[in-house]
Amino acid sequence: MKYFNTIVNWNMLNSNEQKNILLRPVIKNNNSIKKKVKKIIENIQVLGEKALREYTILFEKCHINKFEVSKEKMLSSSLYVNQSLKDAISTAKKNITSFHTAQILSPIDIETQVGVRCQQIYLPLNSVGIYIPSGIAPLFSTVLMLAIPAKIAGCKQIILCSPPPIDNTILYAANICGVDKIFQMGGAQAIAALAFGTKNIPKVDKIFGPGNAYVTEAKLQVSSIFNGPQIDMLAGPSELLIIADEASNADFIAADLLSQAEHSISSQVILLTPSLQLAKKVIISINNQLKNLSKSDDISTALDNSVIILTKDLFECIKISNIYAPEHLIIQTKEPRLILKEILNASSIFLGPWSPESAGDYASGTNHVLPTYGKSVSSSALGLCDFKKRVLIQELTSQGFINLSNTLKILSEAEKLEAHKNAVKIRVDFLKEKI
């Protein structure tokens, strides 16, 4: 285990050094992965489940006769999940449901001028696919974060897939969240099967969920193909930035930094503070807590991507944070809501000492599927709207049309769109003949 001891004074750096200190771990543009994924997608499109079965043997080291998990197995999964975990999942489900139900938008119905009615309505996506990767432990929390809003949105078919064997906790969470079908399949081949369908696996309209480099590349490729599905986002390594002052609890900050660094060796954590005393306390606490963590070596590797930045004041912390545009932002200061007013770019924000990032990961109610790699500048956390589509409606009365007709003719003529102008003129002439 390496000793973490990285404090950098922001104002001792030149502009290039300041830029470099905020660089994220490089995501390699791997042409080998691109080519392999392209071949997998092509084989699934042509050979369907035959190719899917061969890839499952190759990558998952198991033979699957039937990819779909039976309803009986989904229901019986409850028997293999202990009650304390069921209770915790129930609490998380309740909070996530409450927060996402509050996101239901009302339709818009207005008259922009007399006789011109404009509406905006929201319709659920028909079929969505949820990908849950395998790992050291089952990621049932991601099932909740994706299946619950899909159900609230009214998606008619919710499909989940995960590499075999699928843990009972995943099956249990999927069942209580209203997932319709579950398939034992993983990797780029699973994304391709969801994207284009097979004999027994339905094609979906949009694919959600995280995964490794192959899954991410597959999502990118299928979404770029004509008639391919939409995707939620391309997830990068997880990241956390903390703004703290002398009033902050150093042990809390250290624990939060370590919890985020735990995600993967590519994770990045940053502390911004004007207090050198706090920075030193945090370093001591990080190294003390790290000794007691089972993944200390991996966390230490992630800390190589990480830094504590000493600033002249909190205003400078805000400026740096807005430049970095973190996935997760913790504001642990004396008056966090004053800082909040100045934050422009962050995917999910945690205020005060009692709001660890772990709360958002699991059970506060907000979604943990978030833009990374600075994308919070222009992108948002996953929400109910991602499972719906906006539809626009307009209805003009004859008088409303006449009132607007001259405007339409002038504008279409200015853009040299003769057929547009004619579509207006032919109606005007028709109405004049009736008078």
Swiss-Prot record:
Active site per the UniProt annotation: E327 (proton acceptor), H328 (proton acceptor)
Keywords for the protein's UniProt record, in alphabetical order: Amino-acid biosynthesis, Histidine biosynthesis, Metal-binding, NAD, Oxidoreductase, Zinc
Cofactor(s) the protein requires to work: Zn(2+)
Alphabetical GO biological process terms: L-histidine biosynthetic process
EC number(s) stated in the UniProt entry for this protein: 1.1.1.23
Reaction equation(s) it catalyzes: L-histidinol + 2 NAD(+) + H2O = L-histidine + 2 NADH + 3 H(+)
Task performed by this protein: Catalyzes the sequential NAD-dependent oxidations of L-histidinol to L-histidinaldehyde and then to L-histidine.
Family: Belongs to the histidinol dehydrogenase family.
Alphabetical list of PANTHER family matching this protein: HISTIDINE BIOSYNTHESIS TRIFUNCTIONAL PROTEIN, HISTIDINOL DEHYDROGENASE HDH
NCBIfam families per the UniProt record, alphabetical: hisD (TIGR00069)
Protein name: Histidinol dehydrogenase
Organism of origin: Buchnera aphidicola subsp. Schizaphis graminum (strain Sg)
Gene: hisD
